[in-house]
């Protein structure tokens, strides 16, 4: 289901009554409090789950699903993703965007010379990294920081960046 976006990752179980520990993959973990249904997905398996109860913790979320009533059933959910339809994401302010929206955008330098296309965005402790497939069939990892990323234009489908000398040059 291509129209789904991950908002959580099931890390393990909690207690014996079917609760699971979830790592939030969203900047809005409180969204779990108002979400009634998610889709659980792992590899090629996917099915809907109805949220019964949620407890927000410091870095994790505890979730109880109506369909899961014991630890044995909860164990089957471990290492799966909790997803929602993209049309249910939290609406952002103007000039804000989600990282998944950057995938597929064309990357230009300040002179509008095409550099490549964003393949994906890697989450990194220091800063996120744009993975760009360049026009020279190379991969460029570009930190997603203001020093390099000068403009993101979702409506027109591009990102304007300023690279340091040598970032695109081939090594001899």
UniProtKB/Swiss-Prot annotation:
| Coiled coil location | none
Q: Which SUPFAM superfamilies match?
A: PRC-barrel domain (SSF50346), Translation proteins (SSF50447)
Q: InterPro entries given for it? A: PRC_barrel-like_sf, PRC_RimM, RimM, RimM_N, RimM_N_sf, Transl_B-barrel_sf
Q: Which Gene3D superfamilies match?
A: PRC-barrel domain, RimM
Q: What is known of its domains?
A: The PRC barrel domain binds ribosomal protein uS19.
Assembly and partners? Binds ribosomal protein uS19.
Could you tell me what this protein is called? Ribosome maturation factor RimM
| Species this chain originates from | Carboxydothermus hydrogenoformans (strain ATCC BAA-161 / DSM 6008 / Z-2901)
Q: What is the gene name? A: rimM
